Amino acid sequence: MRKAHELAIGERAVIIDVDNSHPSSHRILEIGFTPGQEIELLNYSLFKDPLAFAIRGTIIAIRKEEANCIQI
């Protein structure tokens, strides 16, 4: 399995799971990064932190550390 921060710009994937042991996992789930949702990496800043994802018809930027707990 890959992590969301490993996507290339323009690449899409479906979320398989969110690592519940990660401190930010509750926040990630609350903002819509839930299993079964399709995400697309739109852009990122220097060093891939933060990353901008398209999900559920909106754009959400999260830190690389948070994207690391999203399994695709």
Language-model region placement:
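Compact, glycine-rich, soluble single-domain proteins
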Residues: 1-72
